[in-house]
From Swiss-Prot:
EC number assigned by the record: 7.5.2.7
Catalytic activity: D-ribose(out) + ATP + H2O = D-ribose(in) + ADP + phosphate + H(+)
Role, per record: Part of the ABC transporter complex RbsABC involved in ribose import. Responsible for energy coupling to the transport system.
Pfam family, one: ABC_tran
The keyword Nucleotidyltransferase is assigned to this record: no
Protein name as it appears in the record: Ribose import ATP-binding protein RbsA
Record keywords, A-Z: ATP-binding, Cell inner membrane, Cell membrane, Membrane, Nucleotide-binding, Repeat, Sugar transport, Translocase, Transport
One cellular component (GO) term of this entry: plasma membrane
Positions of ATP binding: 51-58
PANTHER family registered for this protein in UniProt: CARBOHYDRATE TRANSPORT ATP-BINDING PROTEIN MG119-RELATED, D-ALLOSE IMPORT ATP-BINDING PROTEIN ALSA-RELATED
Subcellular location: Cell inner membrane
Record family assignment: Belongs to the ABC transporter superfamily. Ribose importer (TC 3.A.1.2.1) family.
Gene, per the UniProt record: rbsA
């Protein structure tokens, strides 16, 4: 039975909810996707909707936007019941959904995109002047810096997003749903979007914000509602938000259990040794050891050289100096193929551009690194590859209907597990992970942490690069910190230098000495 968490959120006494969804249920082929979900949104509120993949967030929002029709439940706008049967009736009710994949016509002007399907006319002709004037007014209200006559395809992604928002405002929308709106944005573009969202909030527009990025939720949300397994778990106010409570609500267990790794007090023998490795530019001569069953965290600010170290070891980039040893034997690694041949794996930070073959099947993506090993007289042993892929799907809880599903059609979390499965198929002695949970929801993070901990327990030596300090602190047996291309510090609880976020940042910024444990 689900227990709801009460909230102290106190809207003005006279405030009527702009949106109430009560008892919403939806089934697909008899399987419940939503079960009695409630959601209440107030004017001028940024309301975050959170939950892991499959929790029901997208289904609930598609019902609100008219893409699906609920099997049960009621929707009220400003206290009045409404029937939303298609996207048109949703827009008439003042609801607009801005998808992660932008819905703009790149070859048309900003004005033409804003008024698409609702053009202004004078007699039998389009009234372009009136449309451009109204478009300019809406864009000005958003603080946009581009012109109504600009071609949308020439704009940055963040500006194209503003075009979509402008189109919604032109339709007098009072409820905006934003689904992972920062997924393709830079940090600067993200902050610009936040400014727009805050302005919309001040204008009384309600925003339902879907994101797995905790830092965005803390920066924007007035309240948070959480779904899990198609059920409403509860809501929190800004004051009640904490990582511990969110994790417990989303995955059903405490933060203490989130990072399952038990720190190694007596790690195994040295497996990987790096001596004075350098690319002559971004990485100054760096030396360290990595032991069997150890998770070695590599921390530092963006641009510190962490990724570059991993790529040098893997042979993806050319080193100008340094040596790499595996089990005491000097390696000659000139390419990733050389690294793979000796049992060194590397999960890159950008799974879409550097890791996966998106149009290829899940089966082939998983088996890619085993094809050479399993080839016999030029004939691939697909039976072996199929078994590896089937076992990986089961062991890693990869959610897909069948092995022929393309990687591009999977969620971020399942894509990342697919990539992990590919590297584990070669039975690596050393596995380097670069931002292993970037762009995945909290449920997938928990599963990936379990996989990493299991590998460590099996004796795999793991080098983990991460910008998420709780991840580094929660999983690492030791932590090396880089600053401006140099290794500047080591944290290890067993030698009296405590692994904490504060101590990592002291080294990363050069601010002060670390705190002893």
């Amino acid at each position: 039975m689900t227990t709801n968490i009460k909230t102290d959120f106190s809207p003005p006494a006279t405030a009527t909810p702009v949106l109430e969804m009560q008892g919403i249920a939806k089934r697909f082929h008899g399987v419940p996707a939503l079960q009695g979900v409630n959601l209440t949104i107030y004017p001028g509120e940024v309301h975050a909707l959170m939950g892991e993949n499959g929790a029901g967030k997208s289904t609930l929002m598609k019902i609100l936007a008219g893409a699906y029709i609920a099997d049960e439940g009621e929707i009220r706008i400003n206290g009045k019941g409404v029937k939303i049967t298609d996207p048109g009736t949703a827009r008439q009710a003042g609801i607009n959904l801005i998808y992660q994949e932008l819905n703009v016509a790149p070859n048309l002007t900003v004005t033409e995109n804003i008024f698409m399907g609702s053009e202004l006319t004078r007699g039998q002709f389009l009234d372009r002047k009136a449309m451009e004037l109204e478009a300019q007014q809406v864009l000005a209200s958003l603080g946009a810096s581009f012109a109504p006559t600009d071609i949308v395809g020439t704009l940055a992604i963040a500006e194209q997003q503003q075009v979509e928002i402008a189109r919604a405002l032109k339709d007098n929308s009072r409820i905006l749903v934003m689904d992972e709106p920062t997924a393709a944005l830079s940090d600067r573009e993200t902050e610009r979007l936040f400014e727009v969202i805050r302005k919309l909030r001040n204008d009384g527009i309600a925003i339902i914000y879907i994101s797995h990025r905790m830092e965005e939720i803390y920066a924007l949300a007035d309240r948070i509602s959480v779904l899990r397994d198609g059920q409403y778990i509860g809501s929190l106010t800004r004051e009640e938000i904490s990582p511990q409570r969110l994790v417990q609500m989303m995955v059903g267990r405490s933060m203490q259990d989130f990072y399952e790794h038990q720190r190694q007090s007596n790690p195994g023998p040295v497996v990987l040794e790096v001596r004075n490795i350098s690319d002559g530019r971004k990485v100054q001569p760096a030396s360290f050891q990595l032991r069997a069953g150890e998770i070695l965290g590599l921390a530092g600010l963006v641009g510190a050289g962490r990724t570059e170290v991993s790529r040098l070891i893997f042979g993806a980039d050319r080193k100008v100096s340094g040596e790499v040893f595996l089990n005491g034997k000097k390696l000659e690694i000139h390419s990733p193929s050389d690294a793979i041949a000796v049992g060194i794996g590397y999960v890159p930070e950008d799974r879409k551009d550097q890791g996966l073959f998106l149009e290829m099947s899940s089966r082939k993506n998983i088996g890619l690194n085993r094809l050479k090993q399993d080839a016999n007289l030029g004939i691939v042993n697909w039976g072996s590859v199929n078994k590896i892929a089937t076992d990986a799907v089961e062991n890693f809880h990869i959610r897909l209907a069948n092995l022929e599903i393309r990687a591009v059609d999977l969620s971020g979390g399942n894509q990342q597990k697919l990539l992990l499965a590919r590297w584990l198929a070669i039975n690596p002695r050393v596995l380097m992970l670069d931002e292993p949970t970037r762009g995945v929801d909290i449920g997938a993070k928990s599963e990936i942490y379990r996989i990493i901990s299991d590998l460590s327990a099996q004796g795999v030596a793991i080098l983990m690069v991460s910008s998420e300090l709780p991840e580094i602190v929660g999983l690492s047996d030791r932590v090396l910190v880089m600053r401006e291309g140099q290794l500047v510090g080591e944290l290890d609880n067993s030698i009296g230098k405590e692994i904490t976020q504060e101590n990592i940042m002291h080294y990363a910024t050069g601010a002060s000495e670390v705190t002893a444990s």
